[in-house]
Structures are given as structure tokens and as C-alpha cells.
């Protein structure tokens, strides 16, 4: 069984904790210019043909605009087996929820690039799909050399990366579900007020 949630293509390369949301919001927000005009600053690097960075004018994009329904769950570490965790993430994806969490990205880059780097690099991860037959999660991010990549991470490696710190006592997962039929509206009076107050 396989489930892959939509991603706007090309993906907007940005800081994972929040801006990966740009990969999953309604395409209308982009085609209308609303997101680019209001929130994103992009930097294109010609040497590798990538849109490498996105940032916010307003940091509260996700919470303030009502674009997403957000969920949060913490699993007690002692009861959080690979099977339980991976099944729960698959269930989130089945219900249309994208998964965000913290992992030890050193484990991921060691797996992807056959390296043996030591240490912990705590970083956000973004999961948008799975394949139970292959036992992999689909993810994307800056994994190596500042290049944005899509990757398939085996359940076993994924669990190892998420369970890197038993001292925390739990493994936390954040889910984002796009609100259906969200209407992107410009608040023209508010925009005019902002411009006239700066003059």
C-alpha cells in the first residue's frame, strides 16, 4: 500500500519547520501571486539551478492565516516502538495530514550518502508519503551540500533518527492538514492603511 500527499512543484526550498508548508498549500495561492507578494523572498542560485531560500515577512503565516488544521502528539519513549510510530505516521498521511518531527539528521545523511559521521544534528523533517511494500517514508529537505532533495527513508532508519534522544522522554509529531476550500483574500483596506501609515 502506498500514499503520497500532494506537493506543489517545483518545491519551495525553505526552512523545514514551517516553510515546507509552502509545498502543500493550495496552488491558487501561488498562481494568484498572493504568497509570493505577501510572504516569500526567494533566492535563485544559477550554479545549481535551485530556488534555495524562502523567508517570511510575517513569521506567523501558518497560525494566523488559518490555512492549516494542526495537530500535536507526544508518544512516551518507553512505549514508542518502530511499529507503533511508523503505523501512526502512515495513519496521519492516510487522513491527509503531513508529518513534521525532529530527528537526528546525521543518521539520515549517513544512510543516504554512505557516510560514517558521528554526533547528533537535530533538525526538522517533513514526511509527505509512504510505501508499506517498500517500508519507506517519502521526505524532502536539505540533506547534503545545500541541495534540496527528495528521499525515501526506510522505516527502520527513520525510527532510529526520530528516537535519537531517550532523555526527552517522548517523541513528538506535528501534523498539518490543509483546510479544504480555503479562500485566499487580500485585505485591501488593511494593505492601504499599512502603506499610508509608512508614508
Regions found by a protein language model. Give the residues of each.
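Conserved small/polar residues in nucleotide/adenosyl-binding loops
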Residues: 195-199
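Conserved active-site-adjacent core of cysteine acyl-enzyme catalytic domains
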Residues: 2-181
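Non-catalytic accessory segments flanking enzymatic or RNA/DNA-binding domains
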Residues: 183-191
Amino acid at each position: 500500500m502506498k500514499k503520497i500527499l500532494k506537493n506543489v512543484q517545483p518545491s519551495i526550498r525553505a526552512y523545514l519547520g514551517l516553510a515546507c508548508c509552502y509545498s502543500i498549500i493550495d496552488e491558487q495561492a501561488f498562481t494568484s501571486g498572493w504568497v509570493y507578494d505577501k510572504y516569500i523572498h526567494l533566492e535563485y542560485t544559477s550554479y545549481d539551478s535551485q530556488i534555495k531560500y524562502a523567508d517570511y515577512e510575517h513569521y506567523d503565516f501558518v497560525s494566523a492565516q488559518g490555512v492549516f488544521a494542526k495537530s500535536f502528539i507526544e508518544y512516551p519513549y518507553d512505549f514508542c516502538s518502530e511499529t507503533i510510530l511508523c503505523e501512526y505516521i502512515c495513519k496521519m498521511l492516510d487522513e491527509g495530514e503531513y508529518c513534521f518531527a525532529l530527528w537526528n539528521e546525521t543518521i539520515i545523511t549517513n544512510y543516504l550518502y554512505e557516510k560514517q559521521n558521528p554526533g547528533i544534528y537535530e533538525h526538522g523533517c517533513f514526511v509527505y508519503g509512504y510505501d508499506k511494500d517498500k517500508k519507506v517514508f517519502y521526505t524532502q529537505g536539505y540533506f547534503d551540500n545545500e541541495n534540496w532533495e527528495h528521499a525515501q527513508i526506510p522505516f527502520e532508519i527513520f525510527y532510529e533518527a526520530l528516537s535519537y534522544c531517550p532523555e526527552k522522554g517522548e517523541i513528538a509529531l506535528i501534523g498539518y492538514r490543509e483546510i479544504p476550500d480555503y479562500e485566499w483574500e487580500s485585505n485591501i483596506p488593511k494593505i492601504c492603511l499599512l502603506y499610508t501609515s509608512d508614508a
